[in-house]
Amino acid sequence: MRVLLTSFAHRTHFQGLVPLAWALRTAGHDVRVAAQPALTDAVIGAGLTAVPVGSDHRLFDIVPEVAAQVHRYSFYLDFYHREQELHSWEFLLGMQEATSRWVYPVVNNDSFVAELVDFARDWRPDLVLWEPFTFAGAVAARACGAAHARLLWGSDLTGYFRGRFQAQRLRRPPEDRPDPLGTWLTEVAGRFGVEFGEDLAVGQWSVDQLPPSFRLDTGMETVVARTLPYNGASVVPDWLKKGSATRRICITGGFSGLGLAADADQFARTLAQLARFDGEIVVTGSGPDTSAVPDNIRLVDFVPMGVLLQNCAAIIHHGGAGTWATALHHGIPQISVAHEWDCMLRGQQTAELGAGIYLRPDEVDADSLASALTQVVEDPTYTENAVKLREEALSDPTPQEIVPRLEELTRRHAG
């Protein structure tokens, strides 16, 4: 069958789609990836066939006032301490309004939706798998008669909150049932003769790649697949080719955005605290310039995460799904300094399961970070629990093993 994967131009989101794309390809299906032009190199680098459509989004160019409105519903989604608030009608409606006004229309811009629909109508895929922010994929699928599903790369917050919102909305008086996402999708789909249905918001089904302990209960039809992290095309650097006996810690992801790395002096103090670790600390990504670092600190712009973590005792990161999944896959303890979207939730879940420590970015400092590192490295129960989570993840079917199920669902939903 013909399978079309689609994503707005966000490299790490796309990377979460790659293992299943290759599983479908090696099963003999014709697979193409339609995305905004900025993603083309990443698609080609994954060895997949790219179809550039539309114009690139400008999500990160939104003005601070608008960003603040979105952040009210995307920062510190604390399921452990804000549960009642997060499930209130006011919060659920506010989230639907903010994302449907300031996020989804920006990443699904008019030219992207139109050109994706045109391509789908011409190529006639049997199945469209869409990244969960890329609602254009659902519209294109309905416009050409294909089956379609969301391919989740992280925690299903969109499906979870959409389900809670709809349940409360339908209990309200008929004259007071606003639906910002439904209204926006109705307008977008209507341009192509497609009527709104809830499948445009959540897919006809979803593919969830998180292990059982981390899945959110959405009540929706879901196909479970093993998390199999892909970190992008890469080359192993010389320093990582050998020295497998070297004891390492990895620090990665948004480090420069933390208060403990606000400037070069603060960054240097943080590194000095962490350098007490007996081994090498590899710090990836950008941080403030510093003229000197301790001898056991290695600063690098990029490193193949899957290779590095094979020889790490622990990782400190910002909670991103790809980094988190790679650490989970290798069974190492995680220290998550996270606050955005689903990053906080996974960090808290990992900590609750005894495989790491969660730290709030607005509370962490050099001392607390160094203390957390010492704790997860010296207490073997963190590694033991991380290995248990790895084993749990490995119990899920591989992407290749779910292909027959996807074929069956495609036959059921097509047309």
From Swiss-Prot:
Entry superkingdom: Bacteria
Keyword Lipid metabolism: no
GO molecular function, one term: hexosyltransferase activity
InterPro entries the UniProt entry points to: EryCIII-like_C, EryCIII-like_N, Glycosyl_450act, Glycosyltransferase_28, UDP_glucos_trans
This enzyme's EC code(s): 2.4.1.328
Gene3D superfamilies: Glycogen Phosphorylase B (3.40.50.2000)
Coiled-coil portions: none
Keyword set, alphabetical order: Antibiotic biosynthesis, Glycosyltransferase, Transferase
SUPFAM superfamilies per UniProt: UDP-Glycosyltransferase/glycogen phosphorylase (SSF53756)
Catalytic activity: dTDP-beta-L-mycarose + erythronolide B = 3-O-alpha-L-mycarosylerythronolide B + dTDP + H(+)
Enzyme class: transferase
GO terms, biological process: antibiotic biosynthetic process
Record flagged with keyword Hydrolase: no
Other remarks on this protein: It does not require an auxiliary activator protein.
Role summary: Involved in the biosynthesis of the macrolide antibiotic erythromycin. Catalyzes the reversible transfer of mycarosyl from dTDP-beta-L-mycarose to erythronolide B to yield 3-alpha-L-mycarosylerythronolide B. It can also use TDP-beta-L-cladinose.
Family: Belongs to the glycosyltransferase 28 family.
Name of the protein in question: Erythronolide mycarosyltransferase
Organism: Saccharopolyspora erythraea (Streptomyces erythraeus)
